A protein has these predicted regions:
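Conserved class I S-adenosyl-L-methionine
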Residues: 1-41, 51-55, 169-200, 245, 260
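Acceptor-substrate binding/catalytic loop of class I
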Residues: 203-219
Length: 288
């Protein structure tokens, strides 16, 4: 029997089924549409499947990709002598702070240059960004369930707000209450299911033994506003059902681009869908 959690996790296979090809293309299209114009400094704290760093670098941005992990007890290092932008003091001379030998983060030695931008990878605790200076990022990407996997999301969102410059933006994707309730129903946790509408924080056990934090629109707004961020919009990652997408692609295998455009143009209740995508910004500094 297919578990409800499979609605947001692509199968580990060499060739993605039709629906997951659609899901991936929608994710990429939403990210491309959100990315700022020009060249900027971005921080990506997304989960491992998030394509944000790759797409941002292709668009000309410099991206610090924070890879979640517990680094050895060494400080930040110069990544290499290949022209990477880290010099021990900053991301492009301004963003990444050397915290000494306290083990806050470790460069993994890789600086990937795209045709226009670059990705600098750092192994660190992505929920605590002490290695970044205040206001160093023009935008932050927290895709691939970052604020659901980190259960103490208040810590992560506060760190995101701190590193954003005034008027900087954040794009995030979280697991929704709709998904959480479906997972609880699959597991026959009826008592917990009854409590979901009244709970301030909804933590749902996952089939693999992990726990995810699920959100409704009101909880998303409360989380972001608590960190001083203003939510601009909330929308489902996808509105179209897996059965509908699969049926359409079986009938017309070349209709994927058309389906993606239709998905992006579709009006949707912000509480629908297995995942919610959020765009928010940090207020501009008021003149004294």
């Amino acid at each position: 029997m297919q578990h409800a959690a499979s609605a947001i996790i692509a199968p580990e296979v060499g060739f993605l089924p039709a629906y997951w090809q659609f899901h991936e293309e929608v994710t990429r299209a939403q990210l491309r549409a959100w990315l700022p114009t020009g060249r900027h400094t971005l921080v990506d704290v997304s989960g491992p499947r998030g394509p944000g760093a790759e797409l941002a670098a292709e668009a000309g941005h410099t991206v610090l990709r924070v890879i979640d992990g517990v680094p050895p007890g060494r400080g930040l290092e110069d990544p290499s002598s290949d022209g990477g932008s880290l010099n021990g003091r900053g991301l492009d001379g301004r963003g990444l702070e050397d915290r000494g030998s306290d083990g806050r983060g470790e460069l993994d030695g890789s600086t990937r240059r795209d045709r226009h931008g670059q990705i600098i990878r750092l192994v660190a605790d992505s929920s605590r960004l002490q290695f970044l200076n205040d206001g160093c990022a023009d935008a932050v990407i927290a895709e691939d369930r970052a604020l659901s996997v980190h259960l103490a999301a208040e810590i992560l969102i506060a760190e995101i707000a701190r590193v954003l410059r005034p008027a900087g933006r954040v794009l995030a994707c979280v697991d929704s209450l709709v998904l959480g309730m479906a997972v609880l129903a699959d597991q026959h946790h009826w008592a917990h299911l009854v409590d979901v509408p009244h709970a301030e924080v909804v933590l749902v056990p996952w089939p693999d033994g992990s726990i995810t934090r699920c959100y409704g629109p009101d909880q998303v707004r409360e989380l972001f506003s608590g960190a001083g961020l203003t939510v601009k919009w909330i929308r489902p990652r996808t509105v179209f059902s897996e059965s509908m997408v699969t049926h359409c692609l079986q009938r017309e295998p070349d209709s994927l681009p058309k389906l993606v455009r239709a998905e992006l143009a579709a009006a949707a209740d912000e509480s629908l869908g297995a995942q919610l995508v959020i765009s928010a910004s940090k207020p501009r500094t008021r003149p004294h």
